[in-house]
Swiss-Prot record:
An annotated GO BP: tRNA aminoacylation for protein translation
Associated disease: Microcephaly, progressive, with seizures and cerebral and cerebellar atrophy: A severe, autosomal recessive, neurodevelopmental and neurodegenerative disorder characterized by progressive microcephaly, severe seizures in infancy, atrophy of the cerebral cortex and cerebellar vermis, and mild atrophy of the cerebellar hemispheres, resulting in profoundly delayed development and hypotonia.
Organism: Homo sapiens (Human)
Primary site of residence: cytoplasm
Stated name of the protein: Glutamine--tRNA ligase
Modified sites of kind N-acetylalanine: A2
GO CC terms: aminoacyl-tRNA synthetase multienzyme complex; cytoplasm; cytosol; mitochondrial matrix; protein-containing complex
Sites where the protein binds L-glutamine: D303, Y438
Sequence motif 'HIGH' region, location on chain: 270-280
Gene giving rise to this polypeptide: QARS1
Catalytic activity: tRNA(Gln) + L-glutamine + ATP = L-glutaminyl-tRNA(Gln) + AMP + diphosphate
Length: 775
């Protein structure tokens, strides 16, 4: 049908010309609306009135199952369905009853077919609603929420026409209140402002009590409760767009509900061939968080189907990271737990003519739109014998595979289900020499564990068709796969292969090098798990891929550490200072608050002796304008001591380098307040401090247009600076690995596992927020 004819048809249905043109841009909607209109005209034998046309548009735009189009059009054309509430009920009914035949008696009862709502009934329902709210209505007049009255009337008269209810409400309110006065036309500023202020107070209180981030971002749990509205309820998988319904579906879902009791079940299924990274933190939060938000359970399932690349250290590290982020799996499972069942199902696929043994080499299978395998139509009995021979080790690696008979969404034909590998498995030993692929294993393991929501990243969308196909081909419970966007960071690589290259070339020490964005690296650097979870909450769950700046993650880290990391003082590049008139014979004990903003969190004690050490940068013989720290004629305060020091003599070595300073001190309250107070240490511990910068110079080190030489050419050679002889106050003497501190004026630091008795090692986690007043 020509576009002009379609435009004329759509406007004749009651659509505005603009709406009709917008509809024409959507080919699927246009085709469905044309078909609905054609069928309606055949039923009516005449033109379609506007009311019927609008319902047909609503049907065409909202109906997912096109098999039901004719059925519903017949009800609309015959006026058995003639209101929007009836259409909504009809669409919900066919969505909830995906199998034929439809029970028309039950359908008509659920959709209000034949129910007549008289004007008198509408009048009575509206009058009753107005009487319930009369006092408030008389006070607020036309500022009252009239939608409340319409909602209450509609609740009583489910099948009443909404327009008729609105007209009746308008008429009765006008009769009660009379015409609008000038005050009724004014905007409701004061009331709105009062409500907004109350909302702000409640929100602020919630943020404090729930420990959320300072910008009052919704927690991921709260977001997932919202996302839950978009997901199907357990057992209602068929309501998900694109879900494939077979004659066995409803019975399988019934059995599924009997097993799970309607419980939400998710899973986090990592491959144990590498360390988890920041993107996995989002997946962990999403899967565990969604289950928790809905009182469900989450499995930790290792996809251990590739024994060549799996190592015990990766299993341990993954379990540790899940626990570190604060989550406890309902059960830790392995794909290898189900190898026997997976093999039995593979045999069944062959018996059903849906899989075959193929001898094409790997390079022949690569790419899309490849030619069909010459072995695709080999006899089922032959494939059974050959698959058994594969299991018994009678083929070399790459000599035979088992392939499934389907074409995936991305055009890939007949994905491999099993391949030969003569590598012993870490759990099953040498029992198997054939191993299932991800495409074969993933959906069937989800089915075995009765997962309700299989949440995975967007790159698996092309595998959704094979996911549904395989479960349905075997007539087993089919979960719903839902894809979301990956989380990436600028100035980072997270690919396992590329991290291995970084380790192999010595660019980083290992998977937990603090310059990486693996979770073990972030933990070693000192990032608190709460900060990572808060960061995931800020990013949220979207379908689009998200690439974030590292400073946003660092802001979350500061928010947490500001409240949890006790203060200490450390000096990185020290300068010796001798106080010539020290006010005590030996030393003084200084009480320093662990958290200066909240002294109820306690104090720690540090010595203050005649010799102290300050940062070399806190002294200048010839200061530039605006320099506020120690200089000739410019005293400076020592934090927490109550004393001010003033320069008397500069001691230099043979090369002219300043070796020490001699100063005098006075009470801070005994004279003019100094321009600045600096940190210091006395009788300190020597320690090693590692200062980290970005590992890469460009935002997208893997982008060949930005970094033509490849990511290894983009390394920042100054990404690590080690201070071997830093000094720190004695309050940290008993610190353990991963303990965290704020070194005053320097940043947040964490104790590294390389620490040993006699020398602590600190990693700088993040710097402090920039102080514009510091010079």
């Amino acid at each position: 049908m020509a576009a002009l004819d379609s435009l004329s048809l759509f406007t004749s249905l009651g659509l505005s010309e603009q709406k009709a043109r917008e509809t024409l841009k959507n080919s699927a909607l246009s085709a469905q609306l044309r078909e609905a209109a054609t069928q309606a005209q055949q039923t009516l034998g005449s033109t379609i009135d506007k009311a019927t046309g609008i319902l047909l548009y609503g049907l065409a735009s909202r109906l997912r199952d096109t098999r039901r189009l004719s059925f519903l059009v017949s009800y609309i054309a015959s006026k058995k369905i003639h209101t929007e509430p009836q259409l909504s009920a009809a669409l919900e009914y066919v969505r909830s009853h995906p199998l034929d035949p439809i029970d028309t008696v039950d359908f008509e009862r659920e959709c209000g077919v034949g129910v007549i709502v008289t004007p008198e009934q509408i009048e009575e329902a509206v009058e009753a609603a107005i009487n319930r709210h009369r006092p408030q209505l008389l006070v607020e007049r036309y500022h009252f929420n009239m939608g409340l009255l319409m909602g209450e009337a509609r609740a009583v008269l489910k099948w009443a026409d909404g327009k008729m209810i609105k007209n009746e409400v308008d008429m009765q309110v006008l009769h009660l209140l009379g015409p609008k006065l000038e005050a009724d036309l004014e905007k409701k500023f004061k009331v709105a402002k009062a409500r907004l202020e109350e909302t702000d107070r409640r929100t602020a209180k919630d943020v404090v009590e729930n420990g959320e981030t300072a910008d009052q971002t919704l927690s991921l749990m709260e977001q997932l409760r919202g996302e839950a509205l978009k997901f199907h309820k357990p057992g209602e998988n068929y309501k998900t767009p694109g879900y494939v319904v077979t004659p066995h579906t409803m019975n399988l879902l019934k059995q599924h509900l009997e097993i799970t009791g309607g419980q939400v079940r998710t899973r986090f299924p990592p491959e144990p061939n590498g360390i988890l990274h920041i993107g996995h933190a989002k997946a962990i939060n999403f899967n565990f968080g969604y289950a928790k938000a809905n009182n469900g359970i989450c499995f930790l399932r290792f996809d251990d189907t590739n024994p060549e690349k799996e190592e015990a250290k990766f299993f341990t590290a993954i379990c540790d990271m899940v626990a570190w982020l604060g989550y406890t799996p309902y059960k830790v499972t392995y794909a290898s737990d189900y190898f026997d069942q997976l093999y039995a199902w593979a045999v069944e696929l062959i018996r059903r003519g849906l899989a075959y043994v193929c001898h094409q080499r790997g390079e022949e299978l690569k790419g899309h739109n490849t030619l069909p395998s010459p072995w695709r139509d080999r006899p089922m009995e032959e494939s059974l014998l050959l698959f058994e021979a594969m299991r018994k080790g009678k083929f070399s690696e790459g000599e035979a595979t088992l392939r499934m008979k389907l074409v995936m969404e991305d055009g890939k034909m007949d994905p491999v289900a099993y391949r030969v590998k003569y590598t012993p498995h870490h759990r099953t030993g040498d029992k198997w020499c054939i191993y299932p692929t991800y495409d074969y294993t993933h959906c069937l393991c989800d089915s075995i564990e009765h997962i309700t929501h299989s949440l995975c990243t967007k790159e698996f969308q092309a595998r959704r068709s094979s996911y549904f196909w395989l479960c349905n081909a075997l007539d087993v419970y089919c979960p719903v796969q839902w894809e979301y966007g990956r989380l990436n960071l600028h100035y980072a690589v997270v690919s396992k292969r590329k991290i291995l290259q970084l380790v192999a070339t010595g660019a980083v020490r290992d998977w937990d090098d603090p310059r990486l964005f693996t979770l073990t690296a972030l933990r070693r650097r000192g990032f608190p798990p709460e900060a990572i979870n808060n960061f995931c909450a800020r990013v949220g769950v979207t379908v689009a891929q998200t690439t974030m700046e590292p400073h946003l993650l660092e802001a979350c880290v500061r928010d947490v550490l500001n409240d949890t990391a006790p203060r200490a003082m450390a000096v990185l590049e020290s300068l010796r200072v001798i106080i010539t008139n020290f006010p005590a014979a030996k030393s003084l004990d200084i009480q320093v608050p662990n958290f200066p903003a909240d002294e109820t969190k306690g104090f720690h004690q540090v010595p203050f002796a005649p010799i102290v050490f300050i940062e070399r940068t806190d002294f200048k013989e010839e200061p530039e304008p605006g320099f506020k720290r120690l200089a000739w004629g410019q005293p400076v305060g020592l934090r927490h001591t109550g004393y001010v020091i003033e320069l008397q003599h500069v001691v230099k070595g043979p090369s002219g380098c300043v070796e020490s300073l001699e100063v005098t001190c006075r009470r801070a309250d005994a004279g003019e307040k100094p321009k600045a107070f600096i940190h210091w240490v006395s009788q300190p511990l020597m320690c090693e401090v590692r200062l980290y910068e970005r590992l890469f110079q460009h935002k997208n080190p893997e982008d060949p247009t930005e970094v033509p030489g490849g990511f290894l050419s983009d390394l920042n050679l100054a990404s690590l600076h080690v201070v071997d002889a830093a000094l720190v106050d004695c309050s940290v003497a008993l610190a353990k690995p991963f303990d965290k501190f704020q070194f005053e004026r320097l940043g947040y630091f964490s104790v590294d596992p390389d620490s040993h008795q006699g020398k602590l090692v600190f990693n700088r986690t993040v710097t402090l927020k920039e102080d514009p007043g510091k010079v």
